[in-house]
Amino acid sequence: MTKGTSSFGKRRNKTHTLCRRCGSKAYHLQKSTCGKCGYPAKRKRKYNWSAKAKRRNTTGTGRMRHLKIVYRRFRHGFREGTTPKPKRAAVAASSSS
């Protein structure tokens, strides 16, 4: 038996399956850790030596359903429960007609 090319054809067991956190096929079944996101660790796996991978899945590459709204509210100091002042142009146009 050789340990090279000819023995690779005999492999038939799955080492990795889908990760429930990142969805990639990098969850090692025997180690029970994900090679891409580090699940089940609480902190997401991220390294500076792979700048391109950081660029692929950082904040802002997805929908940001909640953060989009937070950024907008931050610009005005998280004001709540106030009504906007009526615009002068709208008031003048309605009074002239």
From Swiss-Prot:
What InterPro entries does the annotation carry? Ribosomal_eL37, Ribosomal_eL37/eL43, Ribosomal_eL37_CS, Ribosomal_zn-bd
Q: Where are residues bearing Phosphoserine located in the sequence?
A: 96-97
Listed GO CC annotations = cytoplasm; cytosol; cytosolic large ribosomal subunit; postsynapse; presynapse; ribosome; synapse
Amino-acid positions noted as binding Zn(2+) in the UniProt annotation, renumbered to this chain: 19, 22, 34, 37
Q: Which residues carry this modification: N6-acetyllysine?
A: 10
Provide the disulphide bond pattern: none
Q: Subunit structure, per the record?
A: Component of the large ribosomal subunit.
Function description: Component of the large ribosomal subunit. The ribosome is a large ribonucleoprotein complex responsible for the synthesis of proteins in the cell.
Protein name in UniProt: Large ribosomal subunit protein eL37
